């Protein structure tokens, strides 16, 4: 898709690009040096995440239209339910998601990237997502994506608590369709 920027069919380049499946910052640095993208003067916001495959999310933005003022990576901390429960080691986040205190049962996945800034003169908040995959079966991994959705909702709620009229864009690879319950919440 990025290679089609600047073609007659797609003469307008995006101002903001949420990227998933990013190996490291060097990949992004190489990408923005491509001739068609170099003309856009793109900035990069990227953090290494704890994902077991070593992939991250990032935001590319045209510097002439968007000025970031703050950014942070927000970890999605989820655990498998395979270790036997012990009352002292388990906390219930809600009725379906159980959080264990031990790291040996943690599912290491991508963080959610929160970027705030000004799109021209309007303050905007962008959340770049790459929710856990369906690898291992849709049903078996559904709770992981639901936890990602709940984290995303908490980020949005916290921004709206500060400013009820906040402009928020959440984007990325949700590994679910628009009708799945994780997306609709």
Regions found by a protein language model. Name each.
Residues 1-185:
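Divalent cation-coordinating acidic motifs and surrounding scaffolds
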């Amino acid at each position: 898709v990025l290679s089609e920027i600047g073609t007659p069919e797609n003469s307008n380049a995006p101002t903001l690009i949420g990227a998933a499946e990013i190996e490291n910052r060097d990949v992004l640095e190489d990408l923005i040096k491509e001739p068609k993208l170099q003309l856009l003067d793109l900035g990069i916001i990227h953090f290494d995440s704890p994902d077991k495959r070593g992939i991250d999310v990032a935001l590319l933005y045209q510097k002439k239209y968007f000025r970031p003022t703050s950014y942070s990576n927000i970890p999605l901390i989820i655990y498998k339910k395979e270790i036997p429960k012990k009352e002292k080691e388990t906390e219930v986040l809600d009725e379906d998601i159980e959080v264990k205190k031990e790291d040996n049962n943690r599912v290491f996945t991508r963080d959610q990237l929160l970027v705030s800034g000004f799109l021209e003169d309007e303050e905007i908040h962008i959340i770049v997502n790459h929710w856990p995959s369906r690898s291992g079966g849709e049903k078996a991994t559904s709770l992981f994506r639901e936890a990602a959705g709940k984290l995303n909702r908490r980020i949005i709620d916290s921004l709206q608590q500060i400013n009820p009229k906040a402009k928020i864009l959440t984007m990325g690879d949700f590994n679910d369709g628009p009708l799945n319950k994780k997306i609709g919440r």
